[in-house]
Amino acid sequence: MAELIISASDIEGAIEDYVSSFTADSEREEIGTVIDAGDGIAHVEGLPSVMTQELLEFPGGVLGVALNLDEHSVGAVILGEFEKIEEGQQVKRTGEVLSVPVGDAFLGRVINPLGQPIDGQGDIESDTRRALELQAPSVVQRQGVSEPLQTGIKAIDSQTPIGRGQRQLIIGDRKTGKTAVAVDTILNQRKAWETGDPKQQVRCVYVAIGQKGTTIASVKRALEEGGAMEYTTIVAAPASDAAGFKWLAPYTGSAIGQHWMYDGKHVLIVFDDLSKQADAYRAISLLLRRPPGREAFPGDVFYLHSRLLERCAKLSDELGGGSMTGLPIIETKANDISAFIPTNVISITDGQCFLESDLFNQGVRPAINVGVSVSRVGGAAQIKAMKEVAGSLRLELSQYRELESFAAFASDLDAASKAQLDRGARLVELLKQPQYTPYSVEDQVVAIFLGTKGHLDSVPVEDVSRFEQEVLEHVKASHDDILQEIRETKKLSESTEEKLTNVINDFKKGFSASDGSSVVVNEADAEAMDEADVEKESVKVRKPAPKK
């Protein structure tokens, strides 16, 4: 039997080798404790190294976001069910900031602000994530707005046009058709999507903030019936969700849209509506005991919206030339656009479409008030054909509104004023448009041409809509080359204008008004007043004599 010899030096060497190669499996981890919780807010102590906007993990997998970094505690917003969070529970740091998965797999889906599907159609696979808080493109990374984004709504595309990369505010009282304008704009992108051309296709993101569940469901149904869900993502934070979800939802939609924008694609994002996001952020800030300011909003509520809307841009060609167009919606009270949040967002955006409840109740839908609505940069993106036919439209409607109020107190009006009133009434009727019926740009040009060139002056007001529809059907059926030229060249040449005028005059001969009368003007019986004189006529207001 061999003798076992133990060498002290061998044992010492083996121990030294093991110690030098040993790595501990344990990790240093900060664990905090909930000191109080309620109303979707939790205060946590024991996390001295936590970052602002860092994700925290509560028991049960519930997540929270660290917002307030106080000396001895952290104020966190709970994302999800907060009823089970109690005092004394442990909280862990994740070391991550808020991010969401992004990609084409989200098209046609409904998700919550954390990027999780809520439509019952299974999980969404995505390898790419994008942080919610990212810096907006800098000045050198942008280029000017030059491409039109057609809404399909005559009143908007003719007077307050929108360009790709623009922020156009839709503002008005509740129940004035704000969501309808946004949904119609999404529906109008279907033809561009069907072309398969990435330069024409527009991916859409609809962010529902604080809306009723039935409203979100009806929007989804309308998009499905219009064939628009295949290029649309819905981010839903309904009224039943916690304030944290309503606060984050716009940033989630923006992150999804930015992913496509930086990939050289075009995006349209609708925020419906930012008033409710501001209300949710106010509730969070007050619960975190931040100092309140005007209307009890926190001091950084302007930054809340500015850093969101500044992400909408038209990127430079070096970055791919992608764009993200924003349609933020703001709800006013009693048509007061001078309140805190409306004035903030008006100053951030590139224009606004003001929807008025009085016009809506009069049956003017979309109920856009031309006098207050404006597009500051979209004019550069408007096609030449629309510029030509709609050049005088805004002025004529403004003069009509002025004359209309004046005529209510005046019994006698001169011929020019009567002609302006008659023309204005027909233009208002022409711009009316049913919901879910977007117009192609060439159809809009022909329709506006009817009004501004005087072809509707002999048509009774009640027959304007029928006359417009029948003219468009006639042109499509027998003179489609006119529409094709407008669609391809984006211009209305003199020869095309002359041809269109002849087509309309010939059509009038076979059109009968609802009372059976003809709409063909007999030139011999017409009043000796040309169109230029009618346009030049204006209302003169007598000023009071100066005080002595």
Swiss-Prot record:
Span list, region Disordered: 526-548
Chain positions of site Required for activity: 373
Binding site for ATP: 172-179
The keyword Translocase appears for this protein: yes
Localization terms from the record: Cell membrane
A Pfam family it matches: ATP-synt_ab_N
Known catalytic reactions: ATP + H2O + 4 H(+)(in) = ADP + phosphate + 5 H(+)(out)
Origin: domain of life: Bacteria
InterPro entries: ATP_synth_asu-like_sf, ATP_synth_asu_C, ATP_synth_asu_C_sf, ATP_synth_F1_a_nt-bd_dom, ATP_synth_F1_asu, ATPase_a/bsu_AS, ATPase_F1/V1/A1_a/bsu_N, ATPase_F1/V1/A1_a/bsu_N_sf
A GO CC annotation given for this chain: proton-transporting ATP synthase complex
Enzyme Commission number(s) from the entry: 7.1.2.2
EC primary class: translocase
Membrane topology annotation: Peripheral membrane protein
Alphabetically ordered keywords of this record: ATP synthesis, ATP-binding, Cell membrane, CF(1), Hydrogen ion transport, Ion transport, Membrane, Nucleotide-binding, Translocase, Transport
GO function terms (MF aspect): ADP binding; ATP binding; proton-transporting ATP synthase activity, rotational mechanism
Family: Belongs to the ATPase alpha/beta chains family.
Function: Produces ATP from ADP in the presence of a proton gradient across the membrane. The alpha chain is a regulatory subunit.
Subunit and partners: F-type ATPases have 2 components, CF(1) - the catalytic core - and CF(0) - the membrane proton channel. CF(1) has five subunits: alpha(3), beta(3), gamma(1), delta(1), epsilon(1). CF(0) has three main subunits: a(1), b(2) and c(9-12). The alpha and beta chains form an alternating ring which encloses part of the gamma chain. CF(1) is attached to CF(0) by a central stalk formed by the gamma and epsilon chains, while a peripheral stalk is formed by the delta and b chains.
Protein name: ATP synthase subunit alpha
Organism (species): Mycolicibacterium gilvum (strain PYR-GCK)
Encoding gene per record: atpA
